[in-house]
Amino acid sequence: MKFSIISVALASAITVDAHGYLTIPFSRTRLGAEAGLDTCPECSILEPVTAWPNVTEAKVGRSGPCGYNARVSIDYNQPATNWGNSPVVTYTAGDTVDVQWCVDHNGDHGGMFSYRICQDQELVNKFLTPGYLPTEAEKQAAEDCFEKGTLPCTDVNGQSCDFSPDCQQGQACWRNDWFTCNAFQADSRRGCQGVDNAALGSCFTTIAGGYTVTKKIKIPNYISGHTLLSFRWNSFQTAQVYLSCADIAIVGDSASTTKVSATATTLVTSSKTASASCTPAATVAVTFNHLASTSYGESIKIVGSISQLGSWSASSGVALSASQYTTSNPLWTATVSLPAGTKFEYKFVKVSSEGSAVTWESDPNRSYTVPQSCAESVAVESSWK
């Protein structure tokens, strides 16, 4: 009993410290920060709650699956001018994609995290309707649905899916479908920042600078013109849970579209999405949004297995624009028109100021399939590895 009292007191004393939010794909929280409305995107906190060792015990309350930031009084469960009105990225069912969140330097309290997709479109639509704020009962119902739709770490071939070093076998946290941070008290590569071991400032936070935490997820065999990817981080040291979400679309590839669309529960329409009678796009404008910190004079190119990306020749690759680049958000972008259904592998490269030295990303190659749908444009989010 003494331990419990001390633990609660300790957690209460340091609850202001843990901070993090979803950054790739662009979450509603990130969009709120980039619009200048959220002055602390890492501060959407559900507290005090039981966050450990049972990582699914806590009810989400007003935080919902998308998060509530009490510091700036923003409820991300409701669409607003700068978020929630349309997907920020389109994925293909069955694809493996990069996802990333940002943990603040002063707020890395270890723990475990998960990515989730709720396949109850009627319920999700309550979080997509402009002017409507879901009730707490609807928020919890959605959270329960997202929990059922957890995208297991183990679904991605070759991905390391360890058990948390801060959890003991037999505890509720002893599961590797969720992703784990490194040991909270590790001597090196500690906590969540140790997952990528990226440099301080590799992602944006307002308190002390952030560290990226990057993983891969497999998109489920589900089609939606507009749905949500929810992120949940349970802190190990503090009684806190962090939630955020991103608006996404999921299309089927040529082999699965007919099969998946035949199930009435997975086909989605909305005022923002083309109807089923639209003409499929022959070519798609694929925008690559890539985060990569560079030195003065360096540039970024995308090089790949198809001719439009230089056929693996760095000199023939597509140069990305740094027009939106900032120190806190080192964004490089390029848009390439590609035939629908095109499958390819690719990497990003850094080119020196003289153009003579080229640094390639680490293996493995990235892969992508251009959606075959009515959408004429899609965005692909990533960061340097």
Swiss-Prot record:
InterPro entries: Carb-bd-like_fold (IPR013784), CBM20 (IPR002044), CBM20_glucoamylase (IPR034836), Cellulose/chitin-bd_N (IPR004302), Ig-like_fold (IPR013783), Starch-active_LPMO (IPR052282). Coiled coil: none annotated. It comes from the Eukaryota. The keyword Iron-sulfur does not apply. Starch-active lytic polysaccharide monooxygenase that oxidizes the C1 position of starch substrates, but not in cellulose or chitin. Catalysis by LPMOs requires the reduction of the active-site copper from Cu(II) to Cu(I) by a reducing agent and H(2)O(2) or O(2) as a cosubstrate. Residues 19-248 form the Chitin-binding type-4 domain. The modification Methylhistidine is found at H19. SMART domains: CBM_2 (SM01065). Residues 278-385 form the CBM20 domain. Residues 1-18 form the signal peptide. It is an enzyme of class 1 (oxidoreductase). Its EC number is 1.14.99.55. This is AA13 family lytic polysaccharide monooxygenase NCU08746. GO terms for cellular component: extracellular region; membrane. Belongs to the polysaccharide monooxygenase AA13 family. It catalyses: starch + reduced acceptor + O2 = D-glucono-1,5-lactone-terminated malto-oligosaccharides + short-chain malto-oligosaccharides + acceptor + H2O. Glycans are attached at N54, N365. The CBM20 domain is involved in binding to starch. Binds 1 copper ion per subunit. It is found in: Secreted.
